[in-house]
Every structure is written in structure tokens, then in C-alpha cells.
From Swiss-Prot:
<dbReference type="GO" id="GO:0005524">
    <property type="term" value="F:ATP binding"/>
</dbReference>
<keyword id="KW-0479">Metal-binding</keyword>
<feature type="binding site">
    <location>
        <position position="199"/>
    </location>
    <ligand>
        <name>Zn(2+)</name>
    </ligand>
</feature>
<dbReference type="GO" id="GO:0016879">
    <property type="term" value="F:ligase activity, forming carbon-nitrogen bonds"/>
</dbReference>
<dbReference type="GO" id="GO:0008270">
    <property type="term" value="F:zinc ion binding"/>
</dbReference>
<feature type="binding site">
    <location>
        <position position="196"/>
    </location>
    <ligand>
        <name>Zn(2+)</name>
    </ligand>
</feature>
<protein>
    <recommendedName>
        <fullName>7-cyano-7-deazaguanine synthase</fullName>
        <ecNumber>6.3.4.20</ecNumber>
    </recommendedName>
</protein>
<dbReference type="Pfam" id="PF06508">
    <property type="entry name" value="QueC"/>
</dbReference>
<feature type="binding site">
    <location>
        <position position="188"/>
    </location>
    <ligand>
        <name>Zn(2+)</name>
    </ligand>
</feature>
<feature type="binding site">
    <location>
        <position position="202"/>
    </location>
    <ligand>
        <name>Zn(2+)</name>
    </ligand>
</feature>
<comment type="similarity">
    <text>Belongs to the QueC family.</text>
</comment>
<keyword id="KW-0862">Zinc</keyword>
<keyword id="KW-0436">Ligase</keyword>
<feature type="binding site">
    <location>
        <begin position="7"/>
        <end position="17"/>
    </location>
    <ligand>
        <name>ATP</name>
    </ligand>
</feature>
<keyword id="KW-0067">ATP-binding</keyword>
<dbReference type="InterPro" id="IPR018317">
    <property type="entry name" value="QueC"/>
</dbReference>
<comment type="function">
    <text>Catalyzes the ATP-dependent conversion of 7-carboxy-7-deazaguanine (CDG) to 7-cyano-7-deazaguanine (preQ(0)).</text>
</comment>
Length: 222
């Protein structure tokens, strides 16, 4: 069976894709929506796809970034939470980096690709840790989306989220177990060649490797 993977270049979608390699013939898609990290995300998604031996397509969604509403696309200081376990603080961080309707748009486009290519599934990297502050990463969102697809697709395309019940630590452990080269993943909001080390995404990445006790191949500026 074929599947479409929404591959951002980050480790969550990378591990989700790697975990599904034995089950599906995968075609990865990556979006350029005007985010600061677009150049790096596209590069790493392409390199990882080459490593995995899967097809990869880049899609231009510049209009989504032009809507504004996020420091990832409209400029401004990228927030750096002082405590990743402080839900209130991380909720405020999430509001600043939230891109309006991003997962709705990405997943819907993935479904369109799946229907057009006779693929039965769309693979996403939604996870338990991010679901605490991003509701469009939650199991509730997944279940609701799949209920919608029962009506909105002809052949019953499903969204598959293999890491949705995992923390970042567990994602690193799962990726390590299947031999995923984490050096071919990129997580930083800032978009520089070297990870900044202080945005929330970098902080969660670094902590995940530390908690897992697995060597982190990432170079951080701070």
C-alpha cells in the first residue's frame, strides 16, 4: 500500500516515516510556507528522503505565511521558555509560533495527494509532548480528522500518527532503535545552519536526547 508522509525535516515526522517504511511505499511531501527555517527544513527533508530511498516533493504554500499571525513567518523575537514543564509558559510560547490552521492545511493537502496517487494513508509526526500545547497534535484531533475523512474522501484515506502516544524522549528512542540518522533531521525555529539551542523546539530536542541517554549529533549555538 502507498502512503503520503508529511515530512517537515524534524525528528518527529522523520521517526514517524521511518517506523512506517516496512508497511507502506512512501512518498514524502514538505511545505515551504515562508517560515524562517524553510531552507533548512527543505534541505534536511530532501536528504532524509534520499537516505530512506523514498520519493520527495516540495510544495509552495507562501500564501499561508503571508497571512501572518506567527513569529515563524511574520518576524519578531522567537520565544525561549525558561521551563519546558511549565504548561502556562509553554502555552504562551505556542500562541506566538502558531501558524493559523497549519496542520489542517498540511493534512488536507496530504489527503489530496493520497487520493490522487491511490494511497491509503497520510503519515504525520504528531506527538504526545507537543499535544499539551498544540491541540492539532492530539489524539482528539486525529480521531476527528479521520471521522471527517470518512465523509470527505471516496476511498477512505486515513491519517496515521505512529508517534502520537510518545514523548520526545520516546521518539528519540524509537528512532535510535530503527537506526534513523538524526543528523539528517532539523528542529530549530530560527533557521540557521547551526541550531540556536534556545528556542522551544531546540530545547525539547536536546532534552529528549539527554533523557534517552543517546548521543545527540546536533550542533547548538548556545
Amino acid at each position: 500500500m502507498r502512503a503520503i508522509s508529511i515530512l517537515s525535516g524534524g525528528m518527529d515526522s522523520a521517526v514517524a516515516t521511518a517506523l512506517m517504511m516496512d508497511e507502506y511505499e512512501i512518498h514524502a511531501i514538505t511545505f515551504d510556507y515562508g517560515q524562517r527555517s524553510a531552507r533548512m527544513e527543505l534541505e534536511y527533508a530532501r536528504r532524509l528522503s534520499e537516505h530512506l530511498g523514498i520519493e520527495h516533493t516540495t510544495l509552495d504554500l507562501q500564501w499561508l505565511g503571508r497571512l501572518g499571525g506567527s513569529v515563524l513567518t511574520a518576524g519578531g523575537d522567537i520565544p525561549s521558555p525558561s521551563n519546558l514543564d511549565d504548561t502556562v509558559e509553554c502555552l504562551e510560547t505556542a500562541r506566538k509560533v502558531w501558524v493559523p490552521g497549519r496542520n489542517l492545511v498540511f493534512t488536507s493537502i496530504g489527503v489530496s495527494f493520497a487520493e490522487a496517487m491511490d494511497a491509503g494513508a497520510v503519515i504525520v509526526g504528531w506527538d504526545l509532548e507537543e499535544a499539551e500545547t498544540f491541540p492539532d497534535n492530539s489524539e482528539e484531533f486525529l480521531d476527528a480528522f479521520n471521522r471527517l475523512l470518512e465523509i470527505g474522501t471516496l476511498d477512505g484515506v486515513r491519517v496515521v500518527a505512529p508517534v502520537i502516544g510518545m514523548t520526545k524522549r520516546e521518539i528519540v528512542e524509537a528512532g535510535h532503535e530503527v537506526g534513523l540518522p538524526f543528523e539528517l533531521t532539523y528542529s530549530c525555529y530560527a533557521g540557521d545552519r547551526v541550531h540556536c539551542g534556545v528556542c522551544e523546539s531546540c530545547m525539547r530536542r536536546r532534552r529528549a536526547f539527554e533523557l534517552a541517554g543517546i548521543d545527540d549529533p546536533t550542533e547548538y549555538r548556545e
